[in-house]
Amino acid sequence: MTKDEVDDLTANPTALQFVHDHLKSMGATILPDQSLGPYNIKARAPIALWESMFNTEFYAYSHVSGHSSGSVVRAEKYSVPTILDAHVSSVFNTIQTPHMKSQKLPLANHLNAPKASSKAQKLASLLLDNLTTPQLLNNAYGISENSGHPKATQAIFSMYEQLYSADDIVTFQNFVGLPQEKVNQTIGVGPTTVAVCNADNDKCAEGNADLSYIMALSNTPTYYYGTSSFSLAEWIQADIVQSSDPPKVISISYGADEIYVSQGEYEDFKTSALNLGLRGVTIVVSSGDDGVSSPQARNTPAKCGYMPGFPASCPFVTAVGATQV
């Protein structure tokens, strides 16, 4: 289905206009943001108006670790006015906090791996300086061809101003003996320089790794979406759902324990994933490196137990774990 066909099937212009008129009557300014499409409204008003409308209080929060840049203004809870209840599923920038994180284990945690199986030992011959190469992955997964159709587009998603270095991608390609390929387009935050990446490895580790390997295994047009938003649902609605020609495969390596994700955030993302599925888009999500227990159990065995991870738990994505060899 095309975007217009899905919009005709799912949009609710009556509800959208009702919310639009109500916000204006309360004194809010409606922002003409075309990226929101027929599903969302963006508005600006003094914080006192939002506190009164949603029966809440906003505060400035910063992470206790000090690693987060700046603070965010959020509330602990909010209530949608009864008059809007039938038309509003969630309100962004209220209770959504930056829980999302990379689903990969730190490098040091991989160094104490158990003894390899016989199959893994055979695959070890395809290692290069003890690093996993695209050639090894091709062998392990039975991939016979890495070239793809130019219309089979793919994309990497990144959060929290994570970056990548185009020069680092070229270095990787040269190191493993692949032809040089470039990212077709960067939307949002990124790229950066090698110097910035070297100064802070965490700044580029996710973006560099994700791009290097997806481009190596599937040589098709590749896009990089970098967002500073804390909301996965907000990003996917604005940048992907509203695109007339979104990437055909979207890879997401970020996630959070589902208990920390608001119901509105979850439902909005799920609706967007369903919308994109109708349009032939596949969303691939990392289920993490920690099995069912989530990262909380890495250093605290008492926290072992089943902990669903979002967005991997969404029924309209393909959750991907590891393969043991």
Specify the residue positions occupied by each region the protein language model found.
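Substrate-binding/charge-relay-adjacent region of secreted/lumenal peptidase catalytic domains
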Residues: 1-35, 42-43, 47-322
